[in-house]
Amino acid sequence: MKVLVINSGSSSIKYQLIEMDGEKVLCKGIAERIGIEGSRLVHRVNDEKYVIERELPDHEEALKLILNTLVDEKLGVIKDLKEIDAVGHRVVHGGERFKESVLVDEEVLKAIEEVSPLAPLHNPANLMGIKAAMKLLPGVPNVVVFDTAFHQTIPQKAYLYAIPYEYYEKHRIRRYGFHGTSHRYVSKRAAEILGKKLEELKIITCHIGNGASVAAVKYGKCVDTSMGFTPLEGLVMGTRSGDLDPAIPFFIMEKEGISPQEMYDILNKKSGVYGLSKGFSSDMRDIEEAALKGDEWCKLILDIYHYRIAKYIGAYAAAMNGVDAIVFTAGVGENSPITREDVCSYLEFLGVKLDKQKNEETIRGKEGIISTLDSRVKVLVVPTNEELMIARDTKEIVEKIGR
């Protein structure tokens, strides 16, 4: 079975075509700057990269170019679009309704649209990708995999906010959590690496990229996560503030004379590492490099960043009454030995002992255990693979309906 995985953003479509027998990626790429000047398709087959400059006014045109490229004589990896058995889509927000991945029908499309106010930047773009695929590949089943679904097992005590309950009843304001597909994949893979059943383990997964979140996974089910009603809560991120006193935005708005929308943009796009570094960079690699060269301010930023992660790990060890494994994933988590070492230095009370050499060596797509043999809690690096998780869900659902 061949599954086309699509991640449709506001001005881009990322894609992978995966042969599910052996789970081999046949090709992958991104159509970028959709609806903007300078749009193009970057297509990769094995290690070869091809760039097609083309005007892409909308998502449908972008997907059309992707599909044409898949069957192209020179760049293609299949002879006919009929070889695509199913399409799997990433959808950021499924609200409370979707607790697992589902087959797309009119009712599902309507439900995704209904929860769009909860993810105004993402869900409408995700929908454009789904509708384009349904139009251009008629008769091919489409499956949606929600970022929020994995966190729907979180209990009320962890998802309700201490604000008037009517706001939950009226507007469904609660903790939803994000990066769910990543947390699900790496917790599952960590159990495989440890040679244990997921249902027997208490795992804390740390998805540390430009966006970042921590999840407490108890016996295979998520019981808490650091992102909340929106992806703004929790850790210090590339451009997002993470946790802060809710009175601060009101104070700034009053003092600076700025609107709610401007404040929202500041917290989402100009805060976090970018804000702390006074606009120097939102990329942790730049901060690390400057800190290693002796920049005291960047050293402090690293301290703030790592401290927040360690605090959440400590909290989730308490929430689960113990922890067996801590997993690092995503851009920073997979490639920054400094981050992993510094975070783990706070966790010695849990019995965490890091193997310095293994920690240094486990970067650039490598996976494995980076704690010592006698470490009471195992520490792992697992490169995330959300696309594969989406493809697996898609295959499972399509096989169930017997297509």
Curated annotation (Swiss-Prot):
- Top-level taxon of the source organism: Bacteria
Catalytic residues of the enzyme: D147
Keyword Transferase assigned: yes
Q: Report the main location listed first in the record.
A: cytoplasm
Q: Name one GO molecular function term.
A: ATP binding
Could you tell me the keywords of this UniProt record?
A: ATP-binding, Cytoplasm, Kinase, Magnesium, Metal-binding, Nucleotide-binding, Transferase
List of residues binding ATP: K14, H207, I208, G209, N210, G211, D283, M284, R285, G331, V332, G333, E334, N335
Residues reported to bind substrate? R90
- What does the note accompanying the cofactor annotation read? Mg(2+). Can also accept Mn(2+).
Binding of Mg(2+) occurs at N7, E386
The protein's annotated pathway: Metabolic intermediate biosynthesis; acetyl-CoA biosynthesis; acetyl-CoA from acetate: step 1/2
Q: Which PROSITE patterns does the record match to this protein?
A: ACETATE_KINASE_1, ACETATE_KINASE_2
Residue numbers marked as site, Transition state stabilizer? H179, R240
Give me the Gene Ontology terms describing cellular component: cytoplasm
HAMAP family named in the record:
Acetate_kinase (MF_00020)
Tell me which PANTHER family the record gives.
ACETATE KINASE (PTHR21060), ACETATE KINASE-RELATED (PTHR21060:SF15)
- NCBIfam families, per this entry? ackA
Q: Which protein family is it in?
A: Belongs to the acetokinase family.
Spell out the protein name for this chain.
Acetate kinase
Q: Which gene encodes it?
A: ackA
